[in-house]
A protein has these predicted regions:
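ATP/Mg2+-dependent ligation/transfer catalytic cores
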Residues: 1-210, 227-241, 252, 388-389, ...
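Histidine-centered divalent-metal-coordination microenvironment in nucleic-acid enzymes
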Residues: 113, 152-166, 209-223, 257-279
Length: 500
């Protein structure tokens, strides 16, 4: 048995004894025949940011071969707002490397994520998955390096409050049972996500924890490991689908919404990134942040206003991006600083062998911790279109390598203080601000669209569609208009409760 696969929780990987990246059509057919799979699901992202599903009953091996080889037709105009009904037929083709056994299906079912193709059999230019693929390709062409990412998926679980072992309001970070009520739900989600191919780092309860009208609202987080950016997006999409389905099965409600009530922590979708060459992390040089990393950060500093168009996509997003809520408001970056937009977290750069210190019986670890360093974009939230967001971040990081003054920009936007403290008001006032509404975000995207359309990454039609949707909210003054009105705020929250 391959020791690298011996602990892999994906049932197909365990059965075939090969990595999912090496799955072929023959492997899928073999697994279906040998394990009694009776149905196949095609799953694919649509314009609302959710996975859609097409079910197939396996009639015979010839039919199975046909759907795996040819895919199936779908109505693109019902999936994406930018596709006209008169020319809306698209193909969806399964990607065998994404195969997993549906953990919720009563009938044994194998599911796969799909790619979109147009009538000519070419990848659909404006599809979410293809946009991200093009962004990663352009990043590699410009830099000679590869772009990796991982997400921190925050969500609230909502259920009747038993009144027992009440947690401290807004103090739920890393809380344990019985004060944290949904640890078992989270760990079951993690197990299912891992079975579906998700590379999970860890899970924990988060800051948000409160009760309203006899209901407990508990915030949780599942954080992933850095992988190729396309895989990172796929894993986040499947994870959201799994969390919602398990909640539905158990009678809980779930929301990834950026804001669910005034004065309480909203849910973000922080994205960590690292740049890799020949399998080696390029974020550090001699134990400090490298010029490569600082160029990527400079690109994000420049394009941060328009990245909100992909990562903060409904009006409640901008009620989260306010001071003192552990969410960024200004365009800056720093080390281990949670008041900034881009944070450089601890990266195990210490010289000591902490494992040996904690465990005196252990020898020298000799572990290469340089692979761990990432940088984190903190503005996105659960309303994000995950593929567009990570594509936008790949574009921004690439853009930093196309700027002659990237290192100067990085130096100018660096901060090492809490910018929201009174004594740092001068520094705060010197920094550019993020947009404060969907309409303002649309304006920023329109001004900076050339960077995203360069190298044919984002299609003009997609950018036009995003701008049109953001402006349709008419929310330019909404934050000021209803900021102190709890009733109107709750109406807004309810409208976008199940976003993304």
């Amino acid at each position: 048995m391959n020791k690298d696969l011996s602990l892999n929780p994906n049932k197909i990987v365990a059965h075939l004894q090969k990595p999912c990246k090496e799955f072929t059509k023959a492997d899928i057919v073999r697994y279906i025949k040998e394990t009694g799979i009776r149905m196949v699901n095609f799953m694919y992202p649509a314009g609302d940011g959710r996975l859609k599903t097409l079910n197939f009953v396996i009639n015979n091996e010839a039919y199975l071969d046909a759907i795996l080889t040819c895919g199936e037709r779908v109505d693109g105009s019902s999936l994406f707002p930018f596709i006209e009904a008169g020319s809306s037929d698209l193909y969806v083709l399964p990607r065998f490397s994404t195969a997993f056994v549906d953990p919720f299906a009563e009938i044994p079912t194998l599911s796969m994520l799909c790619s979109y193709f147009n009538k000519d059999g070419e990848p659909l230019e404006s599809s979410p998955e293809n946009t991200l693929r093009k962004a990663c390709r352009a990043f590699h062409e410009v830099t000679g390096m590869d772009f990796q990412a991982m997400g921190e998926l925050e969500y609230y679980v909502i259920a009747p409050d038993s009144g027992m072992f009440a947690a401290t309001d807004q103090k739920g970070y890393h809380e344990s049972a019985p004060y944290a009520k949904f640890n078992e739900f989270r760990t079951q989600c993690m197990a299912y996500i891992a079975q579906a191919g998700g590379q999970i780092k860890y899970g924990h309860s988060e800051v948000g924890n409160f009760t309203i009208d006899g209901m407990i609202y508990e915030q949780n987080e599942i954080e992933f490991l850095p992988v190729d950016a396309c895989d990172a997006a796929d894993q986040l999409m499947v994870a959201k689908w799994i969390i919602r389905n398990l909640a539905y099965k158990l009678g809980y409600d779930i929301t990834f919404a950026p804001k669910i009530t005034a004065g309480k922590a909203g849910s973000g979708l922080h994205v960590h990134m690292r740049i890799v060459k020949d399998g080696q992390n390029q974020m550090l040089d001699g134990g400090v942040l490298s010029a490569t990393a600082r160029k990527a950060i400079a690109g994000m500093m420049q394009l941060a206003p328009s990245i909100t168009a992909f990562g903060n996509t409904n009006p409640t997003s901008y009620f989260r991006l306010v001071p003192h809520q552990e969410a960024p408001t200004n365009i800056c970056w720093g080390d281990r600083n949670r008041s900034v937009l881009v944070r450089v977290p601890l990266g195990w750069a210490a010289k000591s062998d902490m494992c040996q210190i904690a465990n005196p019986l252990e020898g020298v670890s000799n572990y290469d911790t340089t692979q761990k360093q990432t940088v984190e974009m903190r503005s996105p939230d659960g309303s994000a279109d995950i593929y567009q967001l990570i594509a936008g971040l790949a574009v921004a990081c690439r853009y930093g390598f196309e700027l002659d003054n990237a290192l100067e920009i990085a130096e100018k936007t660096y901060v090492n203080v809490n910018i929201h403290q009174k004594e740092n008001a001068e520094k705060l006032n010197s920094l550019a601000c993020l947009p404060d509404s969907c309409e303002a975000s649309a304006d920023c995207l329109e001004q900076q669209r050339a960077a995203f359309e360069k190298h044919n990454v984002f299609s003009p039609a997609m950018i036009d569609g995003i701008i049109k949707r953001l402006r349709s909210y008419g929310d330019r003054t909404l934050r000021a208009d209803i900021g102190g009105n709890q009733e109107e705020m709750l109406k807004l929250v309810h409208r976008y409760f199940h976003c993304g």
